[in-house]
Regions:
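Short, well-structured N-terminal submotif of metal-dependent ribonuclease cores
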Residues: 1-40, 55-67
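A generic "structured core" feature
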Residues: 37-40, 94, 139
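Short, conserved alpha-helical segments within structured domains
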Residues: 43-47, 67, 109
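Alpha-helix capping/helix-boundary segments
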Residues: 44, 89, 130-131
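A basic- and aromatic-enriched beta-loop-alpha substructure that forms the phosphate/nucleotide-
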Residues: 50-51
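Active-site neighborhoods of divalent-metal-dependent phosphate/nucleic-acid chemistry enzymes
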Residues: 77-125
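Charged phosphate-binding loop/patch that engages nucleotide di/tri-phosphates or the phosphate backbone
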Residues: 119, 123-141
């Protein structure tokens, strides 16, 4: 069983924001994971910081940029969490997954996350059902 978890931005947001629709599910999974490791990349980090400061998403819970960093720092203090730079070979895998004969702005991010997880040998953890069929190891919470 792969204990190297690459969390999608939706899972990070649910861990950081207690009013997220999936917060309880995410926190329970995270607590039960014990000594497993949890990784983020710059893309997922920026996405979460952006969402935390977006009133349309967060409503009255929207954070200032400084408050968003404060929340991120709280979770970053957990020794099981680490940042991963882009792995060697990511560009090739990302291009392979995103060279589609269609127009879909959402596929760019999905292709990137699936490529990152695949090349780095990580399990992608998400609430996004569409990622489950992406050909990488995906845990759907």
């Amino acid at each position: 069983m792969n204990t190297l978890n690459f969390l999608d931005a939706n899972v990070w947001l649910a861990l950081l924001w207690c009013r997220h629709v999936h917060s309880k599910k995410a926190r329970l999974w995270f607590e039960q994971a014990g000594e497993e490791q949890f990784f983020f990349c710059r893309f997922t980090q920026l996405t979460v910081l952006r969402l935390l400061t977006t009133e349309k998403i967060m409503g009255t819970d929207a954070k200032t940029m400084s408050e968003a960093w404060g929340l991120w720092d709280q979770i970053w203090a957990d020794s099981r969490i680490a940042f991963l730079a882009e792995p060697q070979g990511l560009e090739r895998e990302f291009r392979t997954r995103s060279r589609l004969p269609s127009r879909s702005p959402k596929v760019w991010a999905d292709a990137y996350l699936l490529a990152f997880a695949s090349v780095a040998g990580l399990k992608l953890v998400t609430f996004d059902r569409g990622l489950k069929s992406g050909g990488a190891e995906v845990l759907l919470l």
